[in-house]
């Protein structure tokens, strides 16, 4: 990211949490293959420590509110080892996939 001071960008950490959140929320529906997720909001994001290229991120996600009307609130954390490096609240919506046009 910066010459001589490589870091793993925070925006990619949040993208990773959003991807995990999408898979996580779809695990809560009966037919996940028929649904997709949209990220609606990122809130209360904190980057606590530098993440360097080659560090292994461990991502954890918890549901803060049940899925209601297709919308849910999640809390995601990223760790390197046992050190919390970033955290964020994510609001997502599940949407039914459109059938392909034939």
What do the PLM-derived regions correspond to, one by one?
Residues 21-60, 85, 92:
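Hydrophobic beta-strand-centered segment that forms part of the acyl-chain substrate-binding groove
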Residues 51-102:
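HotDog/MaoC-like acyl-thioester-processing domains
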Residues 1-37, 100-102:
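Hot-dog-fold acyl-thioester-processing enzymes
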């Amino acid at each position: 990211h910066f010459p001589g001071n490589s870091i793993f960008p925070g925006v990619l950490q949040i993208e990773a949490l959003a991807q995990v959140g999408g898979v996580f929320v779809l695990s809560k529906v009966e037919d996940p293959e028929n649904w997709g997720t949209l990220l609606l909001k990122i809130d209360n994001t904190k980057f606590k420590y530098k993440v360097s290229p080659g560090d292994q991120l461990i991502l954890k996600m918890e549901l803060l509110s049940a899925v209601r009307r297709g919308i849910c609130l999640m809390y995601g954390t990223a760790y390197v080892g046992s050190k919390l490096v970033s955290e964020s609240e994510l609001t997502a919506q599940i949407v039914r996939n459109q059938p392909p046009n034939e």
